Amino acid sequence: MVEQDNGFLQKLLKTQYDAVFHLKDENGIEIYPIFNVLPPKKEYPDYYIIIRNPISLNTLKKRLPHYTSPQDFVNDFAQIPWNAMTYNAKDSVIYKYAILLESFIKGKIVHNIRKHYPEVTYPSLGRIPEIFAESMQPSDLSSNPINTQENDEKAGLNPEMKMAFAKLDSSITERKPTNQDYRMQQKNSPAFPTHSASITPQPLASPTPVVNYANITSAHPKTHVRRGRPPVIDLPYVLRIKNILKMMRREVDQNNKTLTLCFEKLPDRNEEPTYYSVITDPICLMDIRKKVKSRKYRNFHTFEEDFQLMLTNFKLYYSQDQSNIIRAQLLEKNFNRLVRIELSKPDEDYLPEGELRYPLDDVEINDEKYQIGDWVLLHNPNDINKPIVGQIFRLWSTTDGNKWLNACWYFRPEQTVHRVDRLFYKNEVMKTGQYRDHPIQDIKGKCYVIHFTRFQRGDPSTKVNGPQFVCEFRYNESDKVFNKIRTWKACLPEELRDQDEPTIPVNGRKFFKYPSPIADLLPANATLNDKVPEPTEGAPTAPPLVGAVYLGPKLERDDLGEYSTSDDCPRYIIRPNDPPEEGKIDYETGTIITDTLTTSSMPRVNSSSTIRLPTLKQTKSIPSSNFRSSSNTPLLHQNFNQTSNFLKLENMNNSSHNLLSHPSVPKFQSPSLLEQSSRSKYHSAKKQTQLSSTAPKKPASKSFTLSSMINTLTAHTSKYNFNHIVIEAPGAFVVPVPMEKNIRTIQSTERFSRSNLKNAQNLGNTAINDINTANEQIIWFKGPGVKITERVIDSGNDLVRVPLNRWFCKNKRRKLDYEDIEEDVMEPPNDFSEDMIANIFNPPPSLNLDMDLNLSPSSNNSSNFMDLSTIASGDNDGKECDTAEESEDENEDTEDEHEIEDIPTTSAFGLNSSAEYLAFRLREFNKL
C-alpha cells in the first residue's frame, strides 16, 4: 500500500513539475530557462553568500524520485522564485519572471496537489530583504552602509542573512554587465529577455545596473574589483576574431561532421613526411588560436591572411582529393560569410561596459618595467609592512590616461583559516581564486613565487628580483581548505604557459617546516567539535586582517607532511623537534642541503599508492638521513666488497663520481654550452681510455667504485630497495657522458673502434648510417666496440663464465651443450687490412663472460674454425659424440703447459655480443 502511495505521489509531482515548462510571459516567451540551472559560482560568488538555500529546476528534477511528502516538494519549489526575488533588483526582468512563477505555484501547482493532499500549503519564507538593494546604490559604493537593528527588522533580515550581507558589503562584489544585458536595457522592452540556459542573476546595485556602471567616470574609478577570473581586455578586432573562431566550430558538412576537424592539427611528420616538403609554411587552427591567446595579431587583416594560408596549404596538398577540396571550399565560404557579419558591426557593440580599455604589453613604474606574468608586491591597506603577493594577468589603460592591472592574489599563512597543527614552509604563500583590479600605483616592487615541486629539483636559473616565495597549495576561501597544486602551468597566464622554466638542479635539498604564526589565537576552550571560524576582515581592498585557527582530528595519512601531529612525514620535510641533520642550511629559504636521499629525485607517486608511506616514512626515533637498504645499513655508508679480479678504474673514477654521485651545479649554461662540455668530457675520457691500455695500472681508490655509484643512483631513482648490484669487469667501464636525445653523432656502441672512424667512412654511406642509427648505450672497453643486442645479469658463477676457446681448441674437440641455430656470418669489410684489425683488437688479460651464446658459423667460414660437425648433429648421434670425446680425453696429455690459454672476449661484463662478431673474433684468433 505504501509503495502504491509513493508511486502515485511521484507521478503527481512529476506532472506538476512538467507544467512549469509550458509557462509563458505576456509576450508568449517561456520563462523556464531563467530558473533551469544555478548561476556559476565563480562568476557570481556573492549569490551563494546571500542565498542560503540555492535551488534550480534541475535540482528539483533530481529530487523528484526521493520525495516522500508533497509538502517538501512545494517548499523546494517555492524557494526558486524567492531566491530570484531576493538576489535581483525589483525592476529587473528576472524579478518579474519570479513573481510570475510564484503566482503559478500558488494558483496551479498547490491547488492541484491539494486535491489529493488537502494539508499542503504554500510556505512562508519571509519578506524579501529590500535593504540590500538600497545599500548597494552606486552613490554609496564608496561607503559602508550601517544597518541598524530597526532597519533589519523592517527588511525581514534574520541574523544569518545580516551576517551574509555584512560579508558581501565588506567584499564589494561587483558583476560586470554582459552584452545581452546591455542590449536589453537599450531596448527597454520585455520582448527581449535573457534566454540563456542558465540562471543569470542581475546585479543588485540598481534597477538599471548597466547604465549606472557605464556612467562611472574617472572621478569615481572602479578600484579593486573582486573577480573569480581575469577580465577580458580585448580590442574590438580581437573580439571579432574570437567570435569567428567560435562560430567556425559549429559549422558542419553534408555528413553532419564538424567542418574544421581536418584543419585543427598539422599532419604527423612520421606519418606524412611529404607534407612538410610540399608545404613550406604550415599552419593550422591550433596555431591560429595560440596566436590569438598570446596577442600575436596586431590587426584583423593578419588573422585573415593566416586563415587563407591554412586553406591554401590544404588545397595544395590535397589537390587530387576531390572530397577534401570540397571541404576546404565550404569552409572558405563560411569563413567569408562570418567575416562580413563581424566587420559590419560597429565597434560600440564590443564595448559592454561603456568604456574603451586598451590592452598593454607592459607598464613602467619607478623606472622598472612590468609585464604580464610578473610577480609583484601590491599595496596592502591592512598592513603596509606586508604587501600583497600577486601575479599580473592583465594590463590596460583607459581613455582618461589611467593604467590598470589585474592580479591574482596569494595569501600568507597568517591570512588563512587553518588547523592549529598545520605546518608551513619558510616564505610560503597560497594561491587564491581572487583576481583583483589595481591601479598600477599600487605596485611596490617585484618578487618571485616558485612552485614547490620545481623548488625541490633546484633553483630558478633566472635572476630573482625581490623576495622569493614558495607555493604548493591552492587556498579555498569558502571551504577553508588547502589543495595541492598538481599542474602549475594552469595557474599561470596563458601567455606564459608555453614557456619553459629553466632550473639549476640541486640534490639533497630538504625543507624545514614551521608552526602556524597565529597558533596562539586558538581559544583556550577550543574543542574538536567547534565550527570552522571565519577570518577577521579588514579593508575590503585587501586580504583578511588576520586568519583563524581551530582544532582538527589527527590524520592517519599525511603524504605531504602538512601537520605536526601526524605520525608519517616525507623525508624531504624536517618538522619541528625532528632530529637535526648535517648539511648546509639556508636560513633565508628555510632549506638544508644534505648528502642523504630525498624524494626530490624520485618519481612522483600517486597519493593513493599503498607503498608511498612505507618508503617515505620518517619517525623521530629514526633520523631521516638513514635511508635504509635491504641490508639495514645506510646506503651511502655500505662497504661493498668487490671481487679481487675487478678492474679498479683509476683515471675514470673521479670523473665518474663527480658526474654520477655529486654533480657540480653551474649557475646557468645554455644547451649549446652544455653539449660542448659533454663532448669535451667525452673526448677526454676516450683519450684516457687509450692511454690506459699502455700505461701501467695503479691501484684505484677504494672509496668510490662504479658499483657503489650505480647502487646510489638506483636508490635515488627507485622507490624499491634493491640488493647489491655489481657492474665492474676487467677492461670494461661506462663512459661518463650524459645521455642526450636525438644526438645524431657516433655516441653509441658501434662495431668499429672510434680511433678508426675516419677509415670507416671509406665503407660508404650504408656503414655510416648503420653506425649513426644505433641507439645502444655508451659502453667502452679495451678492444673494439660491439653491437649490444642483449643484456644479461651476472650470476657470479664461474661455471657460466665461458671463454671464447670453450668452442675452439686444436688438441681437443668438445660437444656444444646448447641448441644449434643457423646464422649467416658477415665477412669483415675488405677495406680493413690485417694490420688495422690487429691494431683494433688488443685483447686484455683474462676476462670471464657471463653469456649464452647461440651461434653456428656458416659453411663458407667453416675452414677457419674447428670441426663443428657436432654442432649440426642431432640427438640421435649425441651418444656417439660423447663416446668419441671420452676416448680422446683418455689419450690426451693433461699437463697445464700443453693446454691452450683461455681466449678472453672483448665484450663488456654482463653483455652478450652478437654471433656475427664472435665468429669474426674467433676467425682472427685462428689466423694467429
Curated annotation (Swiss-Prot):
Residues 883-902 have a biased composition (Acidic residues). Residues 558-586, 598-635, 657-701, 871-908 are annotated as: Disordered. The keyword Disulfide bond does not apply. InterPro entries: BAH_dom, BAH_sf, Bromodomain, Bromodomain-like_sf, Bromodomain_CS, Rsc/polybromo, RSC1/2_bromodom, Rsc1/Rsc2_Bromo. GO terms for biological process: chromatin remodeling; double-strand break repair; double-strand break repair via nonhomologous end joining; nucleosome disassembly; regulation of sporulation resulting in formation of a cellular spore; sporulation resulting in formation of a cellular spore; transcription elongation by RNA polymerase II. Residues 368-486 form the BAH domain. Keywords: Bromodomain, Chromatin regulator, Nucleus, Phosphoprotein, Repeat, Sporulation, Transcription, Transcription regulation. SMART domains: BAH (SM00439), BROMO (SM00297). Residues 621-631, 692-701 have a biased composition (Low complexity). Its main location: nucleus. The modification Phosphoserine is found at S670. GO terms for molecular function: chromatin binding. It holds the Pfam family Bromodomain. PROSITE patterns: BAH (PS51038), BROMODOMAIN_1 (PS00633), BROMODOMAIN_2 (PS50014). It comes from the Eukaryota. Belongs to the RSC1 family. Present with 259 molecules/cell in log phase SD medium. PANTHER family: CHROMATIN STRUCTURE-REMODELING COMPLEX SUBUNIT RSC1-RELATED, SWI/SNF-RELATED. Component of the two forms of the RSC complex composed of at least either RSC1 or RSC2, and ARP7, ARP9, LDB7, NPL6, RSC3, RSC30, RSC4, RSC58, RSC6, RSC8, RSC9, SFH1, STH1, HTL1 and probably RTT102. The complexes interact with histone and histone variant components of centromeric chromatin. Component of the chromatin structure remodeling complex (RSC), which is involved in transcription regulation and nucleosome positioning. RSC is responsible for the transfer of a histone octamer from a nucleosome core particle to naked DNA. The reaction requires ATP and involves an activated RSC-nucleosome intermediate. Remodeling reaction also involves DNA translocation, DNA twist and conformational change. This is Chromatin structure-remodeling complex subunit RSC1. The lineage of its organism: Eukaryota, Fungi, Dikarya, Ascomycota, Saccharomycotina. The gene is RSC1.
